């Protein structure tokens, strides 16, 4: 359980937590017959590339990993598109649908005095557009990108870097994320954790439990208030 006297800062993951990565299907619909299938493989491969990059010291900005992953997903489905068409699809990551609960939940935390940050694998340009598109610029102190230290989640150094950037002892930060691997990484580094389980997934059967499991950002705010 949370010790509310201890938590002063809340970091939020971005993709899948604040914005809906499944919205990428919209950008694919004009180009492929099975946008849902391509979108899922695109997302899965993108995460796999970020995990692999951390293990073999092959860092590239997340937008570029996303580009490689899109190419793989299209190739796997036998879809041949021009570079311009691929770029058009890729640009959806600058305007993914924002979950309706994001701003109300973050507003409650902001009004209660918490310092709010976005902590993401996304490179700075992606995060700038996300904050603008989500209309949360007035609520967050800043964004913190994996690009700053060239390490992706769930590397402990990224969460420790976030603690340094926010000027907060790591055990006074609550990290709110939709990805269980992200929650585990934050917990391992010493943060409090809130898993946003939007699709009612089963919990991972290893490495402990988050401090709280919620359905959305508004419920996350209730847990912290």
Predicted feature residues:
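Short, surface-exposed acidic
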Residues: 34-41, 77-87, 139, 170-171
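Asp-based, Mg2+/Mn2+-dependent phosphohydrolase catalytic module
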Residues: 1-6, 119, 123-124, 128-225
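Alpha-helical elements of Rossmann-like donor-binding domains used by nucleotide-donor carbohydrate transfer enzymes
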Residues: 26-27, 68-72, 88, 104, ...
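A short acidic, helix-capping loop that chelates divalent metal ions and anchors anionic groups
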Residues: 27-28, 50-55, 126-128, 202-205
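Short, acidic loop-to-helix structural element flanking the phosphoryl-transfer center
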Residues: 81-118, 128
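Active-site neighborhood of HAD-like aspartate-dependent phosphohydrolases
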Residues: 1-47
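Hydrophobic alpha-helical core bundles mediating ligand binding, dimerization, or RNAP-core interactions
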Residues: 25-28, 42-46, 66, 89-93, ...
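A metal-dependent, Asp-based hydrolase signature
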Residues: 50-88
């Amino acid at each position: 359980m949370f010790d509310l006297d201890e938590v002063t800062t809340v970091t939020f993951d971005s993709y899948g937590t604040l914005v809906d990565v499944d919205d990428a299907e919209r950008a694919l619909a004009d180009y492929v017959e099975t946008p849902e299938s391509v979108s899922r493989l695109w997302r899965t491969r993108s995460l796999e590339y970020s995990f692999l990059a951390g293990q073999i010291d092959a860092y590239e900005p997340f937008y570029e990993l996303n580009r490689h992953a899109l190419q793989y997903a299209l190739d796997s489905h036998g879809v041949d598109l021009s570079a311009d068409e691929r770029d058009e699809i890729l640009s959806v990551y600058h305007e993914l649908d924002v979950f309706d609960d994001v701003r109300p939940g973050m507003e409650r935390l902001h009004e209660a005095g918490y310092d709010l940050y976005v902590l993401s694998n996304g490179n700075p340009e992606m995060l700038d557009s996300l904050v603008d598109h989500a209309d949360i610029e007035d609520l967050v102190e800043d964004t913190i990108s994996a690009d700053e230290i060239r390490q992706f989640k769930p590397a402990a150094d990224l969460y420790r870097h976030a603690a340094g950037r926010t000027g907060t002892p790591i055990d006074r930060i609550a990290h709110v994320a939709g990805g269980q691997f992200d929650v585990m990484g934050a917990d391992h580094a010493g943060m409090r954790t809130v898993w946003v389980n939007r699709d009612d997934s089963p919990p991972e059967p290893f490495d402990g439990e988050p401090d709280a499991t919620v359905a959305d950002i508004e419920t996350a705010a209730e847990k912290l208030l």
